[in-house]
From Swiss-Prot:
Transmembrane annotation, as ranges: none
Keywords assigned by UniProt, alphabetized: Leucine-rich repeat, Repeat
SUPFAM superfamilies documented for this protein: F-box domain, L domain-like
Name the UniProt record assigns to this protein: F-box/FBD/LRR-repeat protein At5g22700
Gene3D superfamilies the record matches: 1.20.1280.50, Ribonuclease Inhibitor
Annotated LRR repeat ranges: 86-113, 134-160, 161-186, 187-210, 215-240, 272-297, 322-350
Residue ranges of domain FBD in the record: 361-406
F-box domain residues: 5-51
InterPro entries: F-box-like_dom_sf, F-box_AtFBL13-like, F-box_dom, FBD, FBL13/AtMIF1-like, LRR_dom_sf, LRR_FXL15/At3g58940/PEG3-like
Tagged with keyword Repeat: yes
Domain of life (superkingdom): Eukaryota
Length: 437
């Protein structure tokens, strides 16, 4: 063991620093007791990763961080991760640390503040970093500056922040010419601007979250909007129960989307007379070019209401669909599938509604059943066996290209039940699995 320890200690300082860089700074410090050789190695690492919870009090925390930054002030800092969850730390002490990190050509900056108030990022240097590659800010107040330039930023996660005005966030996004990954998490009760615009020619992945689950749901339906124009987008995730309108432009044919929105509808079981159906049409049109779609039961229920009045656009590029359907909307299933003529894979989650199951007939056969649909998975947690078998029978009777049929659920359905339905497809593989809790 000692030989191995000696062998590690004989490595160059640069390599030892690289090894310690993979540890939280507080853990890296513990190596200083190994030997005289290790005593100051941790101070030379290009990473400062500190969490106030790892310290007994705020004074020790501030002293530790200040000592590290002072010792290595002439060297570049590769990564700075700061987690502060107590109000007894003076933000006037913390902000100079961030300014110092930016001045030392930092590449990765993460500030996670959970004060009872928002931490204010007031120094202009943060908005003009030429070296930042990734940036995560949580619970931070961002000021508006006329000029913002982040030429090398590729990953940006902005979570529960306050923006002095709408232009602050828009400028942040538009000032990142090589931005590839963007996450924006907003909370209704701290939002001052209700229209979010994301325009980027470089963006590859976009995740937008707007949460009103804390009870701050606001019924000013026409004001909350999301506008997206990102032609290189490969992945889009929308989790939004507040915005009423979603306008998506130039989405590519290879894109994947995960959609859970409610169009500012507070009760999906009782849509108001004033509900603007055209907002559903706008979202469907914006998504109609994509290849892979996951859609929630809430969103799909509102779409089913829309389809009773308006046609659904064609999703000609769609090959994979993961959708959750309420039993009361079963009659709309063929209508949805008819819009996906080239669908190959369908994962169908069956949900029980608060209403009595309707005795609707599902009889029409979508084109994909006859030409492309090869995989069907039905997932059910609480639905009755009769309902599940009704859906399974629909696919068994009409899907002539089917190669694999999977049932995942708690309803007691045996493989023999499905074999009885699919007996005429000798090449169709059947699988039955229990649903994990």
């Amino acid at each position: 063991m000692s030989n191995r320890g000696d062998r590690i200690s004989s490595l160059p300082d640069e390599l030892l620093c690289q090894i310690l860089s993979n540890l939280p700074t507080k853990n890296a410090v513990t190596t200083s007791i190994l030997s005289t050789r290790w005593r100051s190695i941790w101070l030379s690492t290009p990473v400062l990763d500190i969490d106030i919870d790892a310290f007994d009090d705020a004074t020790t925390f501030v002293s530790f961080a200040s000592r590290f930054l002072e010792f290595s002030k002439d060297s570049c800092l590769h990564k700075f991760k700061l987690s502060v969850e107590r109000d007894d730390v003076d933000m006037c002490t913390i902000m100079p640390w961030i300014q110092d990190a930016v001045n030392r050509r930092i590449q990765h900056l993460e500030v996670d503040c959970r004060f009872s108030f928002h931490f204010e990022a007031v120094y202009l240097t943060l908005y003009l970093s030429e070296t930042l590659v990734s940036l995560r800010l949580h619970f931070v107040t961002l000021h508006r500056y006329e000029f913002v330039s982040l030429p090398n930023l590729k990953v940006m996660h902005l979570e529960e922040n306050i923006y002095y005005c709408l232009e602050t966030l828009e400028n942040f996004i538009s000032s990142c010419p090589v931005l590839e990954d963007l996450t924006v998490v907003r909370i209704v009760d701290i939002i001052t601007e209700k229209i979010l615009r994301v325009r980027s020619r470089s963006l590859n992945s976009l995740k937008l979250v707007l949460d009103s689950s804390n009870g701050w749901f606001i019924d000013d339906i026409d004001e909350w909007k999301v506008i997206i124009d990102a032609p290189r987008l490969a992945y889009l995730s929308l989790k939004d129960d507040q915005s009423a309108s979603f306008v998506i432009s130039n989405l590519g044919s290879s894109a994947k989307a995960d959609i859970k929105v409610s169009f500012n509808v507070n009760d999906i079981w009782d849509l108001p007379v004033t509900f603007e159906r055209s907002n559903v049409g706008k979202l469907l049109t914006g998504l109609s070019s994509i290849r892979d779609l996951t859609i929630s039961g809430t969103t799909l229920m509102i779409i089913c209401h829309y389809l009773k009045h308006e046609p659904m656009p064609q999703f000609c590029n769609m090959v994979r669909l993961n959708a959750r359907f309420y039993d009361c909307d079963l009659e709309m299933l063929p209508c949805v599938l008819e819009s996906c003529p080239n669908l190959k894979s369908l994962v169908l989650g069956l949900l029980s509604s608060a209403e009595t199951e309707q005795q609707s007939r599902v009889s029409s056969v979508p084109p994909c059943f006859l030409s492309s649909l090869e995989f069907v998975e039905i997932r059910s947690r609480l639905c009755r066996k009769r309902y599940v078998m009704k859906v399974a029978r629909y696919f068994a009777k009409n899907s002539v290209m089917l190669k694999k049929f999977v049932y995942v659920g708690r309803v007691s359905i045996q493989e023999e039940d499905l074999l009885a339905l699919l007996w005429r497809y000798s090449i169709c593989e059947i699988e039955v699995r229990g649903l994990r809790r």
